[in-house]
């Protein structure tokens, strides 16, 4: 059941299932930029669209503020106008719930204004192209953000979305080193408690930072909704998020650009993590966030919104303002028709306040979404790729979960996400745990109890080999449930399973069955080391060789 908050910003914001964000990361490098912005025209477009709530930019990634800040940079072409305040007031008058947008960490003005607070990555860089970063462990950066938040919260908004609460890279700045208190690990090694401990430090630091911002917002403006960017939940270890970000948010919210398969998994993940329904699923109305003009079809937008609603969430589409400050009316007319078409579905979801009755659960362990493929790489030589949440970041554990859920979707099997903090498994008949190598004792205890009570557990890979701090590694905590013991060795990066010789990539743990365990399939290895340049069976591939007696399926 959805909580009742009375006549508060939280209640007003969370009663909306159709939402809009107009991206506004426009610089002031040309005199014409933002000169044609009109709050009246902006509000006309929002009203035309038919949405119930609109998120308005108070400050963008450039650090340009759209109100008269005393603590940062005002967009130079506004000539002192408070377009944020005018827009928020106009939306309120029009009966549209206003929510503020603010960015942290990715804040060029703060990084330039306070250069000693910048992120310094593992190769010594303090920015990535156009983006300049500050470190969440730098107290002066936090103080700067709180000062701007205090200004923004003076306005009549019902909620605030704090963007970019994730690590843009592996920060090695002085504040991180001082807070960590130990030398940083020089080599990436997911089998080492030292490296895993460093990763947990990154996650805890970020969660603490997010919670401090949330607590500040609640002190300044009690009763409004506050949430953080949580899309990195599907990006793995590198961006450094944990379920602490969800705990610091009133509802799960974030933007995704990975298409249908990613959305189907993301909405169920958000439904599992959100503290207060509905969660908020954002995506661009253009083909991608990097594309300013090419629009998705009406059917694609409709099905995306419907997928979100079907899982109990609120849909939010992202448009992008033109550099001169104008908007394209054609889209808002299309959006109007789309919202009318979606109205009966919105009303049904709002009135029913339903929850998933699925009997199949897919276990999501954020702590386990690591990348063993980079084991052995020196930290100073590691390249983590572009530091943002706009692409689909490859991660073997996440890829396995996405593949598993796509199979369930094609079988028309209802499923839901179970998280590390889910205590109640009632209603579940089957639980699928995909290579969740890092599980806390309380998690393995719940899984063991689930099996004891008659549930079917499907676990893959290195599930339960370590605790969340990386300790263990000698045997599975759930070895008694699996019926196998770890030999201490792993396979090469290609294996084949059973008589069907099902191909798989990754270094899987090699095990031995205990007495009375029924082995239903064994592993087959290639005849030669994978991708050996001189010794191989086939020049293009690594075909199966001799069958082994290592269990693959028990």
Feature locations, PLM:
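Structural motif
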Residues: 48-49, 155, 311
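N-terminal structural segment of carbohydrate-active enzymes
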Residues: 3-64, 94-96
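Aromatic-lined carbohydrate-binding/catalytic grooves of carbohydrate-active enzymes
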Residues: 42-43, 47-83, 106-130, 136, ...
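Active-site-adjacent "subsite" loops/lids of carbohydrate-active enzymes
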Residues: 100-155, 172, 184-199, 211, ...
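Short, solvent-exposed turn/loop segments enriched in Gly/Ser/Thr/Pro and often Arg
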Residues: 23-25, 55-63, 102-109, 161-171, ...
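Carbohydrate-binding surfaces of carbohydrate-active enzymes
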Residues: 3, 7, 12-16, 45, ...
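Active-site mouth loops of central-metabolism enzymes
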Residues: 24-38, 130-144, 289-298
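An active-site-proximal structural segment forming one wall of the substrate-binding cleft
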Residues: 45, 132-167, 216, 341-348
């Amino acid at each position: 059941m959805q909580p009742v908050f009375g006549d508060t910003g939280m209640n007003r914001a969370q009663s909306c299932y159709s939402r809009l964000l107009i991206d506004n990361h426009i610089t002031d490098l040309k005199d014409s930029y933002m000169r044609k912005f009109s709050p009246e025209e902006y509000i006309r477009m929002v009203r035309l669209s038919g949405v119930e709530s609109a998120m308005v930019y108070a400050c963008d990634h450039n650090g340009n503020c759209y109100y008269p800040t005393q603590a940062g940079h005002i967009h130079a072409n506004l000539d002192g106008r408070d377009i944020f305040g005018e827009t928020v007031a106009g939306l309120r008058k029009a009966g549209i719930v206003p929510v503020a947008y603010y960015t942290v960490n990715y804040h060029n003005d703060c990084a330039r204004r306070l250069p000693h607070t910048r992120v310094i990555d593992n190769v010594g860089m303090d920015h990535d192209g156009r983006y300049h970063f500050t470190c969440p462990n730098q107290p002066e950066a936090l103080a700067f953000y709180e000062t701007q938040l205090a200004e923004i919260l003076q306005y009549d908004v019902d909620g605030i979305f704090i963007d970019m609460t994730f690590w843009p890279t592996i920060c090695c700045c002085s504040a991180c080193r001082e807070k960590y208190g130990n030398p940083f690990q020089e080599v990436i090694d997911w089998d080492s408690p030292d490296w895993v401990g460093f990763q947990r430090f990154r996650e805890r630091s970020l969660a603490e930072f997010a919670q401090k911002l949330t607590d500040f917002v609640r002190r300044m403006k009690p009763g409004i909704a506050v949430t953080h960017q949580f899309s990195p939940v599907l990006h793995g270890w590198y961006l450094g998020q944990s379920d602490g970000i969800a705990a610091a948010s009133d509802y799960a919210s974030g933007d995704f650009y990975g298409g249908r398969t990613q959305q189907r998994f993301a909405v169920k993940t958000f439904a599992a993590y959100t503290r207060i329904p509905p969660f908020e699923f954002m995506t661009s109305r253009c083909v991608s966030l990097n594309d300013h003009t090419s629009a998705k079809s009406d059917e694609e937008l409709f099905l995306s919104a419907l997928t979100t609603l079907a899982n109990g969430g609120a849909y939010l589409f992202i448009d992008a303002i033109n550099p001169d400050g104008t908007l394209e009316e054609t889209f808002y007319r299309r959006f109007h028709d789309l919202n009318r078409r979606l109205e009966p579905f919105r009303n049904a979801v709002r009135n029913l306040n339903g929850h998933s009755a699925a009997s199949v659960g897919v276990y999501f362990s954020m702590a386990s979404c690591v990348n063993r493929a980079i084991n052995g790489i020196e930290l100073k030589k590691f390249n983590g790729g572009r530091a943002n949440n706009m692409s689909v970041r490859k991660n073997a554990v996440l890829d396995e979960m996405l593949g598993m859920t796509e199979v369930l979707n094609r079988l028309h099997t209802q499923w839901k996400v179970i998280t590390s903090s889910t205590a109640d498994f009632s209603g579940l008949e089957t639980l699928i745990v995909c290579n969740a190598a890092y599980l806390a004792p309380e998690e393995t205890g719940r899984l063991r109890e689930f099996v004891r009570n008659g549930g079917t557990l499907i676990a893959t890979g290195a599930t339960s080999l370590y605790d969340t701090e990386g300790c263990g590694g000698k045997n599975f905590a759930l070895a008694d449930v699996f019926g196998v013991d770890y030999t201490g060795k792993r396979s090469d990066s290609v294996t084949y399973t059973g008589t069907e010789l099902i191909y798989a990539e990754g270094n899987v743990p090699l095990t031995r069955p205990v007495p009375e365990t029924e082995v239903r399939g064994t592993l087959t290895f290639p005849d030669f080391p994978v991708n050996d340049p001189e010794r191989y069976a086939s020049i293009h591939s690594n075909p199966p060789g001799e069958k082994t007696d290592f269990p693959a399926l028990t």
